[in-house]
Amino acid sequence: MTQETARETTPGSAPIPHWPGRMVSVGDHEVFVRSAPDPKTPDHAEPALCVHGLEGSSRNWTDLMDLLRTQLACDALDLPGFGDSPPRPDGRYSIAALAQTVIALIEKRQNPVHLIGNSLGGAVSLKVAATRPELIQSLTLISPALPDLHPRLDLVRFPVVGLPRVGPRLIRQYQAALPPERRVAAVIATCYSNPGLYPQARFAAEVAELNRRDSLEYAAAALMGSARALSAEFLRKGRHSPWRDAARVVAPTLVIYGQRDRLVDPRAAGRAAHMFREARIVVLPRTGHVAQMERPDLVAAEIGILLGIPGGFGRLTQERAGEADTQSVQH
């Protein structure tokens, strides 16, 4: 095991625009997929696919994709019912159903991918890697939503939103009590270790996006269904436990936790080290629940180490490489 201490990063002066996207057919439904092209990226660049967390979207990957696109052909999807993706026709939001959507998208590309998932997207990505190993070149999980012996209070309370009759009422009360500006600010405060690192130039756009989401008939159902799915996943025991899925993963794996994550306890890193066959486990100091947004340079550096890319993903990430508390495990 090696341990080193990270220094603070400096947020950029102006955020880049979100990447353009398109609707992609995956069987009986469609998903919205953003791509980050780079004219310098080789035509044979290996594909990467990013999967967002609960109530997130492909917009959560903008800055990390900007760093990875120099070496990888980066895509990020909106899971069904989130972002710009319509819901699945069957209305299912289970981890298995969401994993089916991701699998269909990867199969459409006809090449195995470097799969990267955050929170709910981490649970979905783990399911994909465990059940369809031939589709995965590497797996990166950022604060994955997996059963925890020390669950954070916010994560314990949140599945209540998934309860029939109770969930819709709570959502309506929340929307009525707090205007979109305050709700966006609350999400940032919860998910970031240092909310001051959030690019304020993006704040108005996120408020507008939340207003749009509030007007969609299926948005509340997507939130409730996904919350219910996470709650059910946490209760799975024995051979059906997500941690058993972790033991089945054969792809090179990177698991990143945030030292100041308010939703996923970083002490889960110990269990991750025990359950994955071959993994690099990283705890990023001064980092919250969305490391790919708050510390994209550090995340890109760690992915560069995982993939063995010479020089990492540019000068900045090369300087950051190895700055986190890390341990490598091989069973």
Residue ranges of model-derived segments:
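Alpha/beta-hydrolase fold catalytic core
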Residues: 1-48, 69-73, 106-111, 304, ...
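Conserved alpha/beta-hydrolase catalytic His-Asp/Glu region
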Residues: 175-245
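Conserved acidic catalytic loop of the alpha/beta-hydrolase fold
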Residues: 96-113
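Conserved HGGG/HGGXW glycine-rich cap/lid loop of the alpha/beta-hydrolase fold
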Residues: 29-86, 293
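Acidic catalytic loop of the alpha/beta-hydrolase fold
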Residues: 234-237, 260-264
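Catalytic histidine-centered segment of alpha/beta-hydrolase-like enzymes
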Residues: 263, 284-300
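Flexible "cap/lid" loop of the alpha/beta hydrolase fold
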Residues: 130, 139-178
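Short beta-strand/loop motif that positions the catalytic acidic residue
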Residues: 249, 255-257
